[in-house]
């Protein structure tokens, strides 16, 4: 169809976003269970984490709180080696991030040759897991592991290729026939039979909106707060000439580098002058600014962060005093961080007792972070849900004793007798 009026709109390109369904669908031949409608729900969570500054800050702050000052134990040296390449603190940090980001975590359990104990534990990225469909008893027998689930061609047949590893679920009673198993923690979530949901699942749309608000402001700047001008020419140019004029205008006036540029035209007669018509702004920038504040508050609420000052975000009307920040952080620790820690510690203790059966019951804790150098508890250790009463106090006393010894050694080095 001919363009009768030689009119062309200069459009900005926007990428289509596909939101994965939270429902779980099985493949046609029941070989594995898709993680979201398009089998890419973990990828969606990763994109939100990478593209929303508020959301990623919340996740990182909580993960830092979960990790704390690191793992501690009264049993010496057991935390030094989870596998030949990593210690338990390395594995613990990765598990903590997966737990917060996806709502669950997983690691590979490798038995020794005699199958009498666990020889090594390796973290497995939770986004790589796809569950085998439940058996008739409602139990998941194992998981397929791959980092290529997004390859639609590779998985277009709805079946798992033969080269994709499969690990049976952790069961020490089957160690003889299954030397490698997978330990998966997935808390109960209503309506979810196979995969967990992150605790911020109710804010997924709001987090996506945060990314779009930033995208609006970025494109407004890059496109010269467009469209602010309508330029009409009377040259009866052909399509190639119109495209050349459009490219020239974009290069000369679009973007922040060209702000305040001078518009200069040299024409052979006034009759050929273009018509330049200002387009009034609709006030969308103010609307998106207000929307951004609402989005920030909703994301903080989803992560159960009562005070944005914990993240370094200043809120109008709040004084931001030291005591207020400490109180808000302690509330976050007790209601959010501590439950994460206790769950992770329970899993780690179970593995350590399988690695060192001769040591009996093993107690592991996490030394909590301190916001300030003084004014808080000197040492606070969180232990697992399986820990006996008083074990946290014992670990705290040992840490304080070790710190005092380290301080004494430091003073002796500075002031030798």
Where are these regions (language model features)?
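A contiguous, surface-oriented mixed alpha/beta subdomain in the mid-to-C-terminal portion of proteins
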Residues: 181, 187-347, 358-365
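Activation/maturation switch segments at domain boundaries
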Residues: 281-289, 322-417
């Amino acid at each position: 169809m001919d363009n009768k009026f030689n009119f062309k709109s200069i459009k900005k390109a926007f990428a289509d976003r596909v939101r994965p369904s939270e429902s779980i669908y099985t493949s046609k031949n029941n070989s594995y269970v898709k993680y979201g409608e398009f089998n890419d729900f973990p990828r969606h969570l990763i994109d939100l984490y990478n593209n929303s500054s508020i959301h990623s800050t919340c996740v990182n702050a909580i993960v830092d709180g979960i990790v704390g000052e690191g793992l501690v134990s009264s049993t010496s040296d057991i935390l030094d080696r989870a596998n030949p390449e990593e210690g338990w603190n390395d594995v613990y940090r990765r598990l903590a991030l997966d737990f917060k980001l996806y709502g669950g975590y997983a690691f590979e359990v490798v038995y020794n040759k005699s199958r009498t104990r666990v020889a090594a534990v390796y973290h497995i990225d939770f986004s790589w897991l796809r569950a085998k469909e439940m058996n008739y008893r409602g139990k998941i027998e194992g998981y397929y592991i791959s980092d290529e689930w997004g390859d639609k061609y590779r998985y277009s047949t709805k079946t798992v290729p033969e080269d994709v590893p499969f690990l049976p679920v952790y069961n020490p009673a089957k160690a003889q026939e299954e030397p490698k198993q997978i330990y998966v923690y997935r808390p109960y979530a209503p309506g979810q039979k196979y995969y967990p949901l992150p605790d911020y699942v109710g804010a997924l749309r709001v987090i996506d909106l945060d990314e779009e608000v930033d995208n609006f402001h970025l494109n407004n700047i890059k496109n010269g707060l467009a469209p602010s001008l309508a330029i009409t020419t009377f040259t009866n140019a052909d399509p190639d000439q119109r495209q050349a004029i459009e490219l020239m205008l974009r290069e000369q006036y679009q973007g922040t580098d060209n702000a305040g540029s001078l518009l200069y035209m040299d024409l052979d007669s006034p009759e050929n002058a273009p018509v330049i018509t200002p387009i009034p702004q609709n006030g969308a920038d103010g609307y998106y600014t207000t929307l951004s504040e609402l989005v920030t508050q909703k994301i903080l609420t989803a992560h159960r962060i009562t005070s944005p000052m914990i993240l370094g975000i200043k809120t109008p009307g709040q004084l931001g005093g030291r005591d207020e920040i400490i109180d808000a952080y302690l509330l976050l620790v007790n209601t959010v961080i501590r439950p994460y820690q206790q769950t992770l510690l329970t899993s780690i203790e179970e593995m350590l007792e399988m690695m060192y059966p001769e040591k009996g019951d093993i107690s592991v804790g996490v030394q909590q972070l301190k916001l300030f150098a003084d004014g808080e508890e000197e040492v606070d250790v969180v232990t697992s849900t399986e820990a006996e009463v008083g074990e946290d106090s014992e670990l705290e006393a040992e840490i304080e004793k070790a710190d005092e010894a380290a301080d004494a050694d430091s003073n002796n080095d500075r002031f030798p007798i």
